[in-house]
């Protein structure tokens, strides 16, 4: 007859063994779930970031040498704009000048400085977020430059021949263009932006007979040469993917501004 002391309950080793394994499996599943959740969160963030820039044009991939050249060319333009502003203000302040000369000089000079300074900063800045902002500012300032260039010719040369209305039309278009750039955030096609610039630039054809009769022939020649240089420059703007073509575009734009500024300084103000 077995001893009562030997009637010990069986050890639960066999039943307890699966418990650590089950816990390990649960922990492994939890880690996998956390990893999947992390990947999903990162994917969601990436998708949200991508949706913010959906439809926006990517930043041009200029080389360092190109960006240095782009910054230098329009940095020179900003310096020339300051010089032009000073010369025009001094000339407009002389006795016997047209009443609108001083206002026209200030508007045109500031427009030159703003455009070339914005372009210089856009090409000089490296961080992409800031670069996108300055690209919008740069493109918006082109509208300001076009309207600012019109202002002396409209208020002084064509002042009594519908020039005020033309000046108002230009600045209204400039404001519309700036709002367009700000809200579209460059989702619009590149050709549409260029088309608006060219349409504003050549709007003067509606007052061309009056301008030809009132403006000095040399001033008219300088004005037309500047317009042609701007227009030819857009060809190189479209070819910006070719190395240093954007720099060539800058040179044409700068030359166009120089010719038209000379027309204003020498013959209008």
Question: Locations of the language-model features?
Answer:
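Multi-pass alpha-helical transmembrane bundles in non-GPCR membrane proteins
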Residues: 2-269
């Amino acid at each position: 007859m077995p001893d009562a002391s030997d009637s010990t309950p069986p050890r639960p080793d066999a039943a307890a063994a699966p418990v650590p394994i089950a816990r390990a499996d649960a922990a492994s599943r939890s880690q996998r779930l956390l990893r999947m959740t992390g990947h999903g969160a990162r994917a969601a963030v990436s998708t949200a970031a991508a949706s913010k820039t959906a439809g926006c044009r990517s930043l041009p991939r200029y080389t360092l040498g190109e960006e240095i050249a782009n910054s230098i060319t329009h940095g020179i333009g900003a310096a020339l704009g300051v010089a032009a502003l000073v010369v025009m203000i001094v000339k407009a302040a002389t006795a016997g000048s047209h009443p609108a000369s001083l206002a026209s000089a200030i508007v045109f000079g500031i427009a030159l400085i703003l455009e070339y300074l914005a372009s210089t900063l856009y090409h000089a800045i490296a961080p992409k977020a800031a670069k996108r902002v300055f690209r919008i500012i740069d493109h918006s300032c082109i509208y300001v430059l076009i309207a600012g260039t019109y202002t002396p010719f409209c208020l002084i040369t064509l002042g009594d021949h519908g020039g005020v209305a033309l000046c108002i039309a230009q600045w209204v278009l400039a404001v519309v263009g700036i709002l367009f750039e700000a809200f579209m955030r460059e989702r619009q096609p590149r050709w549409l932006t260029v088309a608006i610039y060219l349409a504003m630039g050549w709007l003067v054809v509606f007052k061309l007979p009056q301008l030809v009769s009132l403006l000095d022939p040399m001033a008219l020649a300088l004005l037309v040469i500047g317009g042609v240089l701007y227009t030819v420059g857009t060809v190189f703007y479209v070819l910006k993917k070719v190395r240093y073509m954007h720099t060539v575009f800058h040179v044409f734009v700068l030359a166009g501004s120089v010719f038209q500024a000379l027309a204003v300084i020498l013959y209008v103000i």
